[in-house]
Swiss-Prot record:
Keywords: Lipoyl
Xref: InterPro entries: 2-oxoA_DH_lipoyl-BS, Biotin_lipoyl, GCV_H, GCV_H/Fam206, GCV_H_sub, Single_hybrid_motif
Keyword Cell wall biogenesis/degradation: no
Entry-linked HAMAP family: GcvH (MF_00272)
Cofactor binding mode and count: Binds 1 lipoyl cofactor covalently.
Residue positions, PTM N6-lipoyllysine: K64
GO cellular component terms attached to this protein's record: cytosol; glycine cleavage complex
Keyword Transferase recorded: no
Domain Lipoyl-binding: 23-105
Lineage: Bacteria, Bacillati, Actinomycetota, Rubrobacteria, Rubrobacterales
Name recorded for this polypeptide: Glycine cleavage system H protein
Source organism: Rubrobacter xylanophilus (strain DSM 9941 / JCM 11954 / NBRC 16129 / PRD-1)
């Protein structure tokens, strides 16, 4: 079973958000990185650009496939994880830590899945 940290909220498309006040850190879930396989490239938006909940904000490329990344939150990108340019494997090695993708200043309250709701969704997919 994939790791599902209890301090995060989740999307149906396997992204997570760590909400801290009016900001969020965003990444993909352990389940998503397992399904993708070895990540070889991540394309992220520019700092200062806007992201919209449920809309694509970049792509992630693995040895198996290229997939869109969907934002769990709406707001302005304040930081991107530039270390992924040189070390995209961090997404596989530590998806909830060093493999984070971007930080966003929230423009609205996100409507996301609790850890329990996300776990049930994974069980339904199996």
């Amino acid at each position: 079973m994939a790791e599902i940290p209890q301090d995060l909220v989740y999307t149906r498309t396997h992204e997570w958000a760590r909400i801290e006040g009016d900001a969020a850190t965003v990444g993909i879930t352990d389940h998503a990185q397992e399904e993708l396989g070895d990540v070889v490239f991540v394309e992220l938006p520019e700092v200062g650009s806007s992201v919209q909940a449920g809309e694509p904000f970049g792509t992630i490329e693995s040895v198996k496939a290229v997939s869109d990344l969907y934002s769990p939150v709406s707001g302005e990108v304040t930081e991107v994880n530039t270390s992924l340019e040189e070390s995209p494997e961090k997404v596989n090695e530590d998806p909830y830590g060093e493999g984070w993708l971007l930080r966003v200043r929230l423009s609205e309250e996100p409507d996301l899945l609790s850890p329990e709701e996300y776990a049930r969704r994974l069980e339904e997919e199996e």
